[in-house]
Amino acid sequence: MSKEKRLIEKEDLIPANIYSESRKQIRKDLVEFKKNRRIALGPYATFYFESFETMVAQVQEMLHIEKGGDEQLKDELIAYNPLVPNGKELVATLMFEIDNPISRGAFLGKVGGIEEKIFMKVDNEEVKALPEADVDRTSEEGKASSVQFIHFKLNDDQINKFKSDNINIELGIDHKEYSHATKLTEANIKSLLADFI
């Protein structure tokens, strides 16, 4: 198993036929696992904190849907391995979820550059989010992407604080058109602790 290496390899996946038979239960278990890793922020933004487990599930599901075998697997590993937390960071998929396409387009047109305004506070010490490299975030026209991949890189002191009892962790966005913050619950923090070495 490659969890300790923080890298998904072919050996971490179950065979396609077994996945297909077990898929319903696997997905049900994943929903439960992800429950405390989902954090809503304001009316439209939701952070889904990724992990080795969520990325294995994503690769497995893509292979199940597209049935591309080993050739596809190479591409999926290139795409999803950078989103496996490396032991000193938290990684999240941030989604702006607005059902109406016209409203969504108008909102995203107002929040260009929002990926530069995301932060986490660990005991009032701010950690700026780093957008995933080589992924489109804000277009040349200033329109934000509805899906953002972000990293929060923490130093050893911040990680130790994260692990301490009664720690105050805050997640926020400070954009002039979308400014919201929320405190992480004890259940959120406990789930995210597994991402650190």
Q: Could you say what each language-model-derived stretch is?
A:
Residues 2-46, 50-89, 97-197:
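Long, contiguous binding/interaction regions
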